[in-house]
Amino acid sequence: MGDLTKSRSRQCPETLGGESKVLLFNRVDDPFTVSATTNEATALNAAVTAVYSYDLSGDGNTLEESMVGDIVTGTRVNSQTAVLTLKKMTVADSAEFNLLASSCAHAVVLTRNGDYIALGITEGCNWTIVSSTGAAKADFNGYTVTGVAQENKLAPYLDSATVTALLAVVV
């Protein structure tokens, strides 16, 4: 059983919602070294050799985590859900998203506050791809990509050295 250790003071309204980028990479065992005390990713596994970067814009890119502890079973499950909107449908993207949907790729989202947050670090994410042409001329044309993972802790934030290592292998 976990005992609380800290209070939290009132926070100033200085943050922004949403994500500005998602980094995807093929599943590997233990992609990050994560501190047990701070839940911060402090190192990148050397097996991560290629990371694919997708820029996000506009509202509608979200990351939500919902952790549920069950006192009866003694378990806790954190559902991580990233919903990403990528404008404009293309042949190349269609082929790549077919691969993504059949993968267990890991994801790191970059928030509008400059934080990098890792998703699906134990088993990767399950991916759903929805392509939409829209109906009216001003409707969204592109992909809604949803990644879902279940972990036993909240998603770890990456420290600066780990961010540097991750960005060094973006192709």
Model region roles, listed by residue range:
Residues 71-92, 139-153:
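Oligomerization/assembly interface segments of phage tail-like spikes and tubes
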Residues 74, 98-100, 109, 135-139:
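A general structural signal for short secondary-structure junctions and capping/turn motifs
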Residues 6-81, 124-137:
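Solvent-exposed edge beta-strands and adjacent loop segments
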Residues 95-119:
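Short, acidic/charged, Gly/Pro-enriched secondary-structure junctions
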Residues 1-2:
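N-terminal export/ancillary region detector
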Residues 20-27, 82-84, 103-112:
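Short, hydrophobic/proline-enriched secondary-structure or compact coil segments at domain edges
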Residues 123-171:
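Mixed-charge, glycine-accented linear interaction segment located at domain edges/termini
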Residues 91-100, 156-158:
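Short, conserved charged micro-motifs
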